[in-house]
């Protein structure tokens, strides 16, 4: 039996598995995003390895941005829980996020806005 493997443990130390999310320093699951990207493509599931890492990083950044703004909105209203209303105020208050996220947020309410032409000047009074 010469020339075969020396056994199950041939002197190499077993290393612990490191996920792609940990390698990239991300919280979002790179492997799961890669699987979903592969299932959505028409070219037989050919997606580059870095595409999933890049997509996960983008999603994580946008989520952190929205949550930070929504947290600020909830702090301003002196509550400890982020509601859909706080998400709506955060997204519609930021010009770039507003142009990116055009979806209707259920339970978000409306953004208060009065057109400038409807606001009367301080010196003018309405006469009856």
From Swiss-Prot:
GO terms for cellular component: euchromatin; extracellular exosome; heterochromatin; nucleosome; nucleus. This is Histone H2A.Z. InterPro entries: Histone-fold (IPR009072), Histone_H2A (IPR002119), Histone_H2A/H2B/H3 (IPR007125), Histone_H2A_C (IPR032454), Histone_H2A_CS (IPR032458). GO terms for biological process: cellular response to estradiol stimulus; chromatin organization; heterochromatin formation; positive regulation of transcription by RNA polymerase II. Variant histone H2A which replaces conventional H2A in a subset of nucleosomes. Nucleosomes wrap and compact DNA into chromatin, limiting DNA accessibility to the cellular machineries which require DNA as a template. Histones thereby play a central role in transcription regulation, DNA repair, DNA replication and chromosomal stability. DNA accessibility is regulated via a complex set of post-translational modifications of histones, also called histone code, and nucleosome remodeling. May be involved in the formation of constitutive heterochromatin. Monoubiquitination of Lys-122 gives a specific tag for epigenetic transcriptional repression. Keywords: Acetylation, Chromosome, DNA-binding, Isopeptide bond, Methylation, Nucleosome core, Nucleus, Ubl conjugation. The keyword NAD does not apply. Its main location: nucleus. The modification N6-acetyllysine is found at residues 5, 8, 12, 14. The gene is H2AZ1. The modification N6-methyllysine is found at residues 5, 8. Residues 1-17, 93-103 are annotated as: Required for interaction with INCENP. There is a cross-link at residue 122 (Glycyl lysine isopeptide (Lys-Gly) (interchain with G-Cter in ubiquitin)). One of its GO terms (molecular function) is chromatin DNA binding.
């Amino acid at each position: 039996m010469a020339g075969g493997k020396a056994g199950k443990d041939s002197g190499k130390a077993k290393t612990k598995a490191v996920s792609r999310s940990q390698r990239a320093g991300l919280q979002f699951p790179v492997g799961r995003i890669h699987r979903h990207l592969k299932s959505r493509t028409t070219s037989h599931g050919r997606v580059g390895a870095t595409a999933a890492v890049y997509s996960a990083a983008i999603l994580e950044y946008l989520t952190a941005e929205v949550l930070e703004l929504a947290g600020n909105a909830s702090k301003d209203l002196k509550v400890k829980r982020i509601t859909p209303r706080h998400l709506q105020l955060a997204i519609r208050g930021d010009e770039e996020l507003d142009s990116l996220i055009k979806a209707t947020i259920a339970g978000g309410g409306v953004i208060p806005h009065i057109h400038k032409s409807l606001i009367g000047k301080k010196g003018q009074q309405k006469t009856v």
